[in-house]
Curated annotation (Swiss-Prot):
Pathway: Cofactor biosynthesis; thiamine diphosphate biosynthesis; thiamine phosphate from 4-amino-2-methyl-5-diphosphomethylpyrimidine and 4-methyl-5-(2-phosphoethyl)-thiazole: step 1/1
Ranges that cross the membrane: none
Function comment: Condenses 4-methyl-5-(beta-hydroxyethyl)thiazole monophosphate (THZ-P) and 2-methyl-4-amino-5-hydroxymethyl pyrimidine pyrophosphate (HMP-PP) to form thiamine monophosphate (TMP).
UniProt-recorded name of the protein: Thiamine-phosphate synthase
Cofactor needs: Mg(2+)
Positions of 2-[(2R,5Z)-2-carboxy-4-methylthiazol-5(2H)-ylidene]ethyl phosphate binding: T162, P163, T164, G193
Family, similarity comment: Belongs to the thiamine-phosphate synthase family.
Record keywords: Magnesium, Metal-binding, Thiamine biosynthesis, Transferase
Pfam families: TMP-TENI
Binding annotation for 4-amino-2-methyl-5-(diphosphooxymethyl)pyrimidine: Q57, L58, R59, D60, K61, N98, S136, K165
A single MF term (Gene Ontology): magnesium ion binding
Source organism per UniProt: Mycolicibacterium gilvum (strain PYR-GCK)
Length: 237
């Protein structure tokens, strides 16, 4: 059986006009830091995207690179996003910016992701125009608000506690079940502590799209890790 990532690569070899990357078709969303302490962002991104990642977001907050070198300044963030964009073009994927509407516009990224306490949506929309905007949600009321407001997708979680968001309580899979029961047509992603071992439980709860971090960023073979997750998501469709 062909995996989604294999079909995407096959299509790229036989078509002279690549299909535009699509939020609607996106199922595997990766958040990565700039990997400054490793210096391998380009190779890592290429491997993860080749494995089937559909959206790759740069989020450097709390990263080893931040601890070693300090916060990622705007110019450096834009440079890192350009590295991701180059890889994303090769693999027909989308690039996302965390929090910063100005950085999204300056870098040309297709996606801006906002938390509950970030820039107001109306202001963000004025800055980024018709780019894709996503929203983090942590309870049912926030998810229902995201369905109603002018965002293009939303994330639901954390499903499990995660070091990416220290101190944040995890509403768990009950929230995933509640959101799945809403039967919204707006794309949404489960997030928080998800890996290949936990993904079946997330799928059983009703999610069909997920955001991962360490499941790929900490993997010895990022491409293989992405392929495994993408294959599991494909099988659940």
């Amino acid at each position: 059986m062909w995996s989604r990532s294999s079909l995407r690569r096959l299509t790229a070899t036989v078509s002279t006009v690549p299909e535009s990357p699509s939020l609607q078709g996106a199922r595997l969303y990766l958040c990565t830091d700039a990997r400054r302490e490793r210096g391998d962002l380009a190779d890592f991104a290429d491997a993860a995207l080749a494995g089937g990642v559909d959206i790759i977001q740069l989020r450097d907050k709390g990263s080893p690179g931040e601890k070693a070198f300090g916060p990622l300044e705007a110019r450096a963030e834009i440079d890192a996003l350009h590295v991701l964009a180059e890889a994303a073009r090769r693999h027909n994927a989308l690039v996302a910016v965390n929090d910063r509407a100005d950085i999204a516009r300056a870098s040309g990224a297709e996606v801006l992701h906002l938390g509950q306490d970030d820039l107001p949506l109306t202001v963000a929309r004025q800055i980024v125009g018709d780019r894709v905007i996503g929203r983090s949600t942590h309870d049912l009321a926030q998810a229902e608000a995201a369905i109603a407001e002018d965002v293009d997708y939303f994330c639901v979680g954390p499903c499990w506690p995660t070091p990416t968001k220290p101190g944040r309580a995890a509403p768990g899979l009950d929230l995933v079940r509640e959101v799945a029961a809403l039967n919204t047509t707006k794309p949404w992603f489960a997030i928080g502590g998800i890996d290949a071992q936990r993904l079946p439980d997330v799928l059983d709860a009703g999610a069909r799209r997920v955001v991962v971090v360490r499941a790929i960023t900490a993997a010895e073979d990022p491409r293989a890790a992405a392929e495994q997750l993408a294959g599991m998501l494909d099988s659940a469709v």
